Design a protein with these regions (language model features):
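Amphipathic alpha-helical dimerization/coiled-coil segments
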Residues: 85-109
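N-terminal helix-turn-helix DNA-binding core of bacterial DNA-binding proteins
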Residues: 3-47
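Short beta-strand/turn micro-motifs at beta-sheet edges
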Residues: 1-5, 65-66
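Beta-hairpin "wing" of winged helix-turn-helix
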Residues: 56-73, 78
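Basic amphipathic alpha-helical segments that dock to polyanions
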Residues: 48-55
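Accessory beta->alpha helical hairpin/"wing" motif in late/C-terminal subdomains of nucleic-acid enzymes
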Residues: 79-83
């Protein structure tokens, strides 16, 4: 795993979180993740596309074609109510796991 790879198993959650802020196209999601992580995470375009397809198939996001900011057709993704619920579950689970790892790392030998 490269230093900038998204942590395995978190891409769907990061996509859902990005879309919870506003509907956006794939490049916008990539930029959002890289911007908020301050460049720590880079998103592979192929992985992102597979993530969108998986989330749409599961009913967690919707997609529609629109004109982008630069007047080009782009597929915009938005969070469904089911997606919002899943994001909450994923976020709670992730925070629980991070707290457990922090406790393990801080434990005295």
């Amino acid at each position: 795993m490269a230093d900038t790879d998204v942590i395995q198993g978190t891409l769907d959650m990061l996509i859902l979180k990005s879309l919870s802020l506003q509907p956006m196209h794939g490049f916008g999601v990539t930029q959002r993740i890289e911007q908020i992580s301050k460049g720590v995470f880079k998103v592979n375009p192929g992985s992102l596309l597979l993530g969108f397809q998986r989330l749409e198939r599961e009913g967690l996001i919707d997609a529609e074609w629109r004109m982008s900011e630069n007047s080009r057709r782009a597929k915009y993704y938005s969070l469904t109510s089911k997606g919002r619920k899943q994001l909450k579950l994923d976020t709670d689970d992730w925070q629980r796991r991070v707290a457990a790892i922090a406790r393990l790392l801080e434990a005295e030998a």
